[in-house]
Amino acid sequence: MSLVSQARSLGKYFLLFDNLLVVLGFFVVFPLISIHFVEQLGWAALVVGFALGLRQFVQQGLGIFGGAIADRFGAKPMIVTGMLLRALGFAFIALATEPWILWLACILSALGGTLFDPPRTALVIKLTRPHERGRFFSLLLMQDSAGAVIGALIGSWLLQYDFQFVCWTGAGVFVLAAIWNALFLPAYRISTTRTPIWEGMERVIKDRRFFTYVLTLTGYFMLSVQVMLMFPIIVNEIAGTPAAVKWMYAIEATLSLTLLYPIARWSEKRFRLEQRLMAGLFLMSLSMFPVGLIGEINTLFGLICLFYLGTVTAEPARETLSASLADPRARGSYMGFSRLGLALGGALGYTGGGWLYDTGHALNIPQLPWFLLGIIGLITLYALHRQFNQRKIESAMLSGN
């Protein structure tokens, strides 16, 4: 094995362990925020949804700045600083007794993610070859699912005692991740050139093909973020206990660990990336329509299975397509900007979802938010279909090679 290949291999193992810490730290805390503040403290879902949406919007909306800074100064300082900021945000969530404190905590958490997320994704692109990139993203997503279950299990167990224990544990994991990166992450440059901050940002904004693709994904993310807001709430409502939420994440982990990698390997030889993305989005949209009409937990888990099946089909294709369309001269900027769809979709999905949830219950129409989310998914599907049929993107890029 050549030195370059050995460095790539060691780098990928480093990324896998680092990703496990990040996922564990996040999922110990965030799935339980809506349960604690809405179900246990009686806050309005709109207030909590706004906090979650604010975190999503700030982190992903400012991602292009975090990526551009990493293009200029390298990945390591941004990652370490960002993880410490995330830990500080979680500590403030533990102290939240008023909505403004929760909002401030979510902003701190978001700024941390703004700094560490784009360079981490850019490192994946740097350390993987194009033909193996889709499979490595699949491995990361499988790990995300397993980490989500373990994190949710730990968080649910700690919630029995005190929500502050939940937050302090999540903060501790991110401090550990910061130390891990500070000690062992080499001083990688993530772009082929040391691009000035504003030049990298300008390069992305002028790339209309990438710009349109990212904005189109807003609707996709409006659906995907509901695993952090409305799905936990309705599982808790129907099951009658917050402990049932861990089974929702167990479903995700089971499907991801058994199907995500095989689906990615099978479909990459038969379908283009955008076709796989649209197929997954169709399943996610389809699963939304009946949710508000059911009152039995096993039926709900069946619909959640369909939703997660769509996710495991779409996510590797979405990540690989974003990476394939990125200019290697400004990888950090591109990966940062690719989060803009998640910023907009997260803000609209969390805040709008919380408002629709409250409105649906006030009007005695509990199916209202779920039906509208399904419609949004289908509209996004149509927009993606038009984009990729009207804009001819090189077949090599779309196949991920």
UniProtKB/Swiss-Prot annotation:
Coiled coil: none
Any one Gene Ontology molecular-function term assigned to this protein's record: transmembrane transporter activity
Gene Ontology cellular component annotations, sorted alphabetically: plasma membrane
Transmembrane portions of the chain: 13-33, 34-54, 78-95, 99-116, 139-159, 165-185, 214-234, 243-263, 289-309, 340-360, 365-385
Pfam families xref list: MFS_1
Membrane topology: Multi-pass membrane protein
Keyword terms of this UniProt record: Cell inner membrane, Cell membrane, Membrane, Transmembrane, Transmembrane helix, Transport
Places the protein is found: Cell inner membrane
Source superkingdom: Bacteria
InterPro entries per UniProt: MFS (IPR011701), MFS_dom (IPR020846), MFS_trans_sf (IPR036259), MFS_Transporters (IPR050171), Multidrug-R_MdtH (IPR022855)
Similarity remark: Belongs to the major facilitator superfamily. DHA1 family. MdtH (TC 2.A.1.2.21) subfamily.
HAMAP family linked: MFS_MdtH (MF_01529)
NCBIfam families linked to this entry: PRK11646.1 (NF008650)
Protein known as: Multidrug resistance protein MdtH
Organism for this UniProt entry: Photorhabdus laumondii subsp. laumondii (strain DSM 15139 / CIP 105565 / TT01)
The gene coding this protein: mdtH
